[in-house]
């Protein structure tokens, strides 16, 4: 049997795999960002790994260094709700999600930068906002967001969540002040500050919550059997909840007792006991005071074998008012969490503590019997290069300073020499003038 030739069907067959391929490419672009190395200064390459560090404000990511670029792969999964999805939520839920966007303003107080836009914004299952693309100030885009720009974009997001006909880009680019919408949208636009905007959203959210609680109820017609099993289930759940709360209570008590025990040892200058007491505590969950106690105790015990002057200098830097990340660094270092210590030191841009953490990491690699020779060589080279990079930069700064001082001294010597020559010429000229006057007197 001979089949009829149908060009339309053949065209559809050809387009189908192309469409699937294009969809795959689109997903790849959403899940991946590529940054050319040519757009980054070589001395900033080591900072790029900050883009894969876990942060409550960003989607988890993995950084891969290629020959000519850095690739960032984002872990976007079913636990992440895109901004566009909240448009279908109930009004009270929508307001709750929108109200939480204010948390992203905290990013402006860190080294990170981000983009506040619908296609860049996701939410966790708890409704907390997380951004996709992140940058580093003065290192890699995006540029920092000013307070005014953050407020403008925040307003545009709120309006777009309730009015799907509006374009976010158009609102941000100048149409926000000209927008004529509902009284709710007008109030959003009129908010002059972030606090006023969030206060208004919170007010609307509370009204919606009250309305739902007063006017809505869910009633089901069920039989006695269902009620019986519900009662049994609730009783079981209550017992489990009480057991969990009891466990949590005693865990917290035990944790607090250890903190207090460490403090008492610190007051007695028993620094070794402080380290032993805090040995397996999670530094990220400790307050600043506890971190200070550990940091000072660690330096006092001189586990690193530091010279006296170096030790005293570090002790002067460790105070109750020190940066919390700086104090956390010493706990991570003391507990052997060297990768975390290196990340913190790099983030703080402190060469002294970065070198100390790198030296400890190299010793750890050297003494790790589980590593193969190839892996040990690879790891050693990786961290040696980072250490040498810091040493080279410090030497360059030192050489430039010495050269500058030498040039200043040379210029000073030349100035003194010129002054001496001028004084000598003045004296010679004065002597000649004197001799001329004497000669003139004799001729009279």
From Swiss-Prot:
It is found in: Cell membrane. Gene3D superfamilies: Transferase(Phosphotransferase) domain 1 (1.10.510.10), Type VII secretion system EssB, C-terminal-like domain (1.25.40.680). Pfam families: YukC (PF10140). The chain crosses the membrane at residues 230-250. The keyword Nucleotide-binding does not apply. Residues 1-229 are cytoplasmic. Residues 251-444 are extracellular. Its main location: membrane. It is a single-pass membrane protein. GO terms for cellular component: plasma membrane. Residues 387-443 form a coiled coil. Keywords: Cell membrane, Coiled coil, Membrane, Transmembrane, Transmembrane helix. Residues 372-444 have a biased composition (Basic and acidic residues). The keyword Transmembrane applies. Residues 366-444 are annotated as: Disordered. Belongs to the EssB family. Component of the type VII secretion system (Ess). Required for the secretion of EsxA and EsxB. NCBIfam families: T7_EssB. Homodimer. This is Type VII secretion system protein EssB. It comes from Staphylococcus aureus (strain NCTC 8325 / PS 47). The lineage of its organism: Bacteria, Bacillati, Bacillota, Bacilli, Bacillales.
């Amino acid at each position: 049997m001979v089949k009829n030739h149908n060009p339309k069907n053949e065209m559809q067959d050809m387009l189908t795999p192309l469409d699937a391929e294009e969809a795959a490419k689109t997903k790849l672009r959403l899940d991946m960002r590529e940054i050319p190395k040519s757009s980054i200064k070589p001395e900033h390459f080591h900072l790029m790994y900050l883009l894969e560090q876990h942060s409550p404000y960003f989607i988890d990511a993995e950084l891969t260094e290629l020959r000519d670029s850095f690739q960032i792969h984002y872990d976007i999964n079913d636990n992440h709700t895109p901004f566009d999805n909240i448009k279908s939520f109930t009004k009270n839920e929508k307001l709750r999600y929108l109200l939480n966007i204010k948390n992203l303003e905290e990013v402006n107080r860190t080294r990170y930068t981000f983009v506040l836009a619908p296609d860049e914004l996701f939410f966790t299952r708890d409704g907390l906002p997380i951004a996709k693309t992140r940058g580093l100030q003065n290192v890699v885009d995006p540029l920092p967001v000013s307070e005014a720009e953050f407020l403008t974009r925040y307003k545009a997001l709120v309006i777009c969540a309730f009015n799907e006909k509006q374009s976010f880009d158009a609102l941000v680019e100048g149409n926000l002040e000209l927008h004529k919408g509902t009284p709710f949208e007008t109030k959003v636009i009129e908010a002059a500050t972030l606090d006023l905007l969030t206060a208004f959203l919170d007010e609307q959210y509370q009204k919606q919550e009250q309305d739902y609680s007063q006017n809505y109820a869910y009633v089901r017609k069920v039989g006695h059997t269902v009620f019986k099993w519900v009662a049994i289930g609730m009783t079981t759940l209550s017992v489990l909840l009480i057991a969990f709360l009891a466990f949590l209570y005693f865990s917290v008590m035990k944790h607090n007792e250890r903190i207090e025990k460490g403090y008492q040892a610190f007051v007695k200058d028993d620094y070794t006991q402080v380290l032993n007491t805090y040995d397996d505590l999670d530094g990220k969950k400790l307050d600043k005071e506890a971190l200070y106690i550990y940091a000072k105790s660690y330096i006092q015990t001189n586990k690193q074998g530091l010279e006296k002057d170096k030790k005293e200098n570090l002790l002067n830097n460790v105070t109750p008012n020190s940066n919390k990340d700086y104090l956390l660094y010493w706990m991570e270092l003391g507990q052997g969490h060297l990768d975390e210590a290196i990340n913190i030191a790099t983030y703080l841009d402190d060469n002294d503590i970065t070198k100390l953490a790198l030296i400890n990491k190299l010793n750890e690699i050297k003494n790790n019997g589980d590593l193969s020779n190839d892996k040990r060589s690879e790891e050693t080279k990786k961290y040696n290069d980072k250490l040498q990079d810091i040493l080279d930069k410090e030497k360059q700064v030192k050489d430039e300073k010495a050269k500058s001082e030498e040039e200043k001294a040379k210029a000073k010597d030349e100035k003194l020499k010129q002054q001496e020559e001028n004084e000598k010429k003045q004296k010679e000229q004065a002597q000649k003038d004197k001799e001329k006057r004497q000669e003139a007197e004799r001729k009279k």
